[in-house]
Amino acid sequence: MIRSRSVLLIFRKVLYQSSCLKCLLCANSFSTSVSSSLGFRATNKELNQMIRSGYIAEARDIFEKLEARNTVTWNTMISGYVKRREMNQARKLFDVMPKRDVVTWNTMISGYVSCGGIRFLEEARKLFDEMPSRDSFSWNTMISGYAKNRRIGEALLLFEKMPERNAVSWSAMITGFCQNGEVDSAVVLFRKMPVKDSSPLCALVAGLIKNERLSEAAWVLGQYGSLVSGREDLVYAYNTLIVGYGQRGQVEAARCLFDQIPDLCGDDHGGEFRERFCKNVVSWNSMIKAYLKVGDVVSARLLFDQMKDRDTISWNTMIDGYVHVSRMEDAFALFSEMPNRDAHSWNMMVSGYASVGNVELARHYFEKTPEKHTVSWNSIIAAYEKNKDYKEAVDLFIRMNIEGEKPDPHTLTSLLSASTGLVNLRLGMQMHQIVVKTVIPDVPVHNALITMYSRCGEIMESRRIFDEMKLKREVITWNAMIGGYAFHGNASEALNLFGSMKSNGIYPSHITFVSVLNACAHAGLVDEAKAQFVSMMSVYKIEPQMEHYSSLVNVTSGQGQFEEAMYIITSMPFEPDKTVWGALLDACRIYNNVGLAHVAAEAMSRLEPESSTPYVLLYNMYADMGLWDEASQVRMNMESKRIKKERGSSWVDSST
């Protein structure tokens, strides 16, 4: 007996520490042979541990080979299937189980309810009605199930029939009312409670907040907070309201509530209520998040420094706050002090350095990340994509697949953007196949597909995807398709689609008008462009940005209307950038407008003194006109300033 127990312990160690399947099966075989000698408790414990470790098939094999099973053995196996939502397997065992107890019935009922949907709820109700005896868990599970499925009337009927209600029953019913928008009924029900408890109070406060009734939530908390039983749990209601205020930017109200909670349990505030009610780590974390929500990093850090007990969330929240305001030195300092880092800590450093353009440091932290998850890969792939290093983004995706990590919608969106940047139709189509095979119903992914196909020359495929999206279209979807037509110079389709967008009640954004104005520029539709520009400001109240002015200069100067173009430039509410002057200079070359070309070139040189673009454009304009002396002078000026010609630009050969 002692020998068998010792050997079984060794095999158990192998079972839970080894990844060798042969060792696992060997341990299973041995466990079966000695289960009777060790009793049900050891066997059930082993089954449970195997199921928790993900070896449910092997656990079932042991279960089938056992010479004897008790109710707990059956319940353990059924519970394993329920947790994996394999309700068919669980039901088969349930139906042949020789003797069930209330735990068996409750496990099946909660499993059906957790699966969601009316069909599973009806199965749960059938079992509930067949139960020989019910406990409060049985009733509460069914009440919650009906409430979550918007059948609040049936939930209330069960609640009223319930022989003995507890705090969970009242909480379930209050939560159900709030989830279904019947907030007043929730308040009335809470007031009917014979003995107020902190759990239903927390449920009511949370429900009021979700229904945007924060002032009422604060009143309820103030009115009943000192009267409820279970006062040590009252802090959860306060924390919920602090989070509610914080999410809505009401940081002063959040801080006022935070300060009402005693710092320490058992301080000298007096009374039993105060002794059992104090701030916990969630209170501090919630208040720090509230400050960071409004960008008050200083107040958040002061509070963080006052914390006596911090958890990983505390550190990550503060680091994330620094990352969001691009204070990477502070983020690095805090990260270096952090005692226990998790995957999120490392991912924040990767995305943080990427957001400030330091891809090298982002890559450094990525490579040092102990356990790389999908989010880790997404962060570094997105970093290279945003930095326009599309090839490295693709190489990382290939490595991600080799290392066995599956892509998600964020991965595919970045890769589709990389395909667009590389103008690589084949790569984009491969990404599209992954989307189809994984059946990812993600709007941003499909938006990226529309852009990718249009930029790679397959505008018809873009339109096919756009048409298939139908009711799932958002403003970005319309922008992508209109932008695709504009990119291809198809102004009529772009403008027609813009009209459909408005008739479908989709409010255009500033990006929409950039695409519309670009479409007008491609087609030389000056009057249409002016009308759309005016409409953008007067009808949609969108303030013109640099891109809009650049497009308007492009369309007017492109049609030889240089006075109009200069009027637009001089009347802009901000200094024109290189895109504006570049559009004018391009038009000057087409129309041989030497005087205005000099103005545009000089303006571009002031903005980017080391750029060769204005010199090359000016040189080529003189060359086109046969003015070789002037062209040579431009080249000499450029060489005297030691400006090197950028890759991709070329001189017109003087020998031709």
Curated annotation (Swiss-Prot):
Chain positions of PPR repeats: 70-104, 105-134, 135-169, 170-200, 203-227, 234-264, 280-310, 311-345, 346-372, 373-407, 408-438, 442-472, 474-508, 509-544, 545-575
GO cellular component, one term: mitochondrion
Pfam families in the record: E_motif, PPR, PPR_1, PPR_2
Domain of life, source organism: Eukaryota
Statement: the UniProt record of this protein carries the keyword Metal-binding: no
Principal place of residence: mitochondrion
Localization (cell): Mitochondrion
Gene Ontology biological process terms from the UniProt entry: cytidine to uridine editing
Protein keywords: Mitochondrion, Repeat, Transit peptide
Residue span of region Type E motif: 580-655
InterPro entries (alphabetical): E_motif, Pentatricopeptide_rpt, PPR_At4g14850-like_plant, TPR-like_helical_dom_sf
GO molecular function: RNA binding
PANTHER family in the cross-refs: PENTATRICOPEPTIDE REPEAT-CONTAINING PROTEIN
Recorded family membership: Belongs to the PPR family. PCMP-E subfamily.
Protein name, entry field: Pentatricopeptide repeat-containing protein At1g62260, mitochondrial
